[in-house]
Amino acid sequence: MKKFIAKLLLAVLPIAIYAGIFVAFEPNDYFGLQGKDTMITRVKQYGASNINSIILGDSRLAHIDMSLVNTTAGREYYNLAFGGASLEESIDLVYFAKKANPKLNEVVLGLSFYTLNASYNTQNRISTIEKQLKNPIAYMSNLQYNTQLATALLGALRGVPLQEGVETSEHTKEDYEQNGEALPYRKDLIAYASVLYNKCAKPNTLTLAKPTQDATLAGINANEISAAQLANEMLKVTKSSSLWSVNEQQLMRLCELGDYCKANDIKLYFVLPPMDISVRELVCAPLGIDKAMLDVIEKLKANDAIVLDYEWTNAPSYKDTQYYDGFHLDTVHGLPQWTKTLFTDIIKG
């Protein structure tokens, strides 16, 4: 009997060690022991929050200061936005939130030309997460989360700190010139705009850009790429090179969501966060995205939706230093200001 117990303990020991490591280091804090703010913790904790106003969207809304939101609005909001969220996932989360909290009465849903792009496809994780919230074993056996665990462990062993939600930087004169010549936009903004072409234009539309923002910026800093020539190349691109089109299926779902919210006494706001002028001029105008998005806004308004548009028709005149990159506001220098603007507009009705 003792030998059997010893063998059993020996067999169970690796599983116990693995479970302990998983619980301690898995990056989504499924078990709530690490005090992290992740997509899964936000979804998991919403049902017990008793908060009737929610925010949804991708990273442009995921990092807003919730204490500033609540102070500005004079009521409490719960943030269900997360980095990399597709429009499909955000819409699905509205229905999830209504099931979790039947008293839900307000939804602030972020969207943009990027998430409305028909070629922007991500795996919809919401139904999977709903199942895994009820089944920890399914969560622990998920390949994607185990890969994330390995990455987190490797980072911990290397002493690499995690700075979740922090997107801020300071800029100097060198960021605006190359070889002593002034540039039309900040170097990193030019590099970032070139990367957006990977999602919005035909392959090889740009001959000077590299596949990633970091690689392009490194090429600019090493004088291997002329930032001015790259910007000019983007300006010369025509609509014929565009692969961008409206995701009509998700646009229809947005309209259906409007009808659902109206039928259930939920106030729905569609919010288009601001972007730097470099994205508008280098990406959207040459590829014809701007005109198509104006049509989208009109369709949403025609469905009696409340549209708060800071991307196109009501773009704030922020300095480029208030943007971390062309698409995301700096979490220190820009995002707080826009957060106040957004929720001041919301309480005005």
Please place each PLM-identified region on the residue numbering:
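Hydrophobic membrane-insertion alpha-helices, especially the h-region
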Residues: 6-26
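Alpha-helical transmembrane signal-anchor/signal-peptide segments
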Residues: 24-45
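Short extracytoplasmic
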Residues: 39-66
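Short hydrophobic beta-strand that contains or immediately precedes a catalytic carboxylate
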Residues: 53-57, 80, 329
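Membrane-embedded segments
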Residues: 60-149
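Secreted/periplasmic serine-hydrolase-like ester/acetyl group-modifying domain
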Residues: 125-258, 262-264
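Active-site segments of SGNH/GDSL-like serine hydrolases
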Residues: 258-285
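C-terminal regions of proteins
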Residues: 285-349
